[in-house]
């Protein structure tokens, strides 16, 4: 018997793969679709698979609406290009309200009034926003949320004193097109714990100068805590991905998305205020993040998707801000605690400030922390550059509802 050669087997495998893809495409084409909706977001890998499995596939099955998903790590650039070309997605999911506010002011977003109950959310998650010439409207809905202001550790619980050495910290600043955001998280969180939510909200809304003493103190505190300007350490952190594993005994200032990693390491977390030098009397508020869905093309299919995302019975990935949703029974104690902080009334929560800022300011902030980390002696120049970009706006950045 003659055995097939490697080339023959390779061709056969390729044909089978193409046949399988064709069958899958044929199955999707043969479905009795009642319409379609385009969705732009930045989820990829496991995050995208989880969203498709828990949200998109059940939605398609129930409503016979084909969700055409477009994922991109350069989300802001792709969306801006699509809008400029006159071909925006029906629904876009962006990480924060600052960029969405600009699109609302430019009359690019369509109100979500009547599609869901904003009372199921803290006001700052799904606020009524007033744009020039319009009555107040709700323009976005939180799809998934994350908790920040967390310090992960193993072993002994950290304190201000034990966290004072830069060598204690695990730090990765690289994140592709958005490199620098781990550093902005530090500066923001330090300001929140040192100066409190009121000052923080004024700053995030462009009503407090970047050159203010409280803001400057946050930058210098961060530089001291992480060893800014130390050549080898700086080079390592600038080229290390934000999700890289930490060496044993290190501390990590990262959000709830790292819970799985630290659970496997046998770790725990403390609130960031416990390790920040100079934490003020209003310390203890939580910095939070979220992916927000907005409608750019108000088709019936797009509105149906928004209703589905707001339904308390929809199994959204990770953490929902919807107070009417039932707690996920499969979550471990740490995950349940995180979910409670994100949803329960009475908790002081503030948006990640850079995500609440206009896009130009946010991007400049990312670059400024990278440059400050490498050359902390040039702080005056960095703050002056950011001050020239400061724009006042009116967003509910903090809340306790």
Predicted regions and their residues:
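Conserved C-terminal helix/tail region of periplasmic/extracytoplasmic solute-binding proteins
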Residues: 343-401
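Short helices/loops that flank or line small-molecule/ion binding pockets
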Residues: 76-88, 106, 163-165, 237-252, ...
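Extracytoplasmic/periplasmic solute-binding protein
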Residues: 139-143, 162-208
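Hinge/lid segment of periplasmic solute-binding proteins
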Residues: 97-149
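Conserved N-terminal structural module of periplasmic/extracytoplasmic solute-binding proteins
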Residues: 1-99, 389-401
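Mature extracytoplasmic/periplasmic domains
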Residues: 286-360
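Glycine-centered hinge/linker elements that transmit conformational signals in sensory
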Residues: 180, 201-237
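Extracytoplasmic/periplasmic substrate-binding proteins
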Residues: 221, 226-301
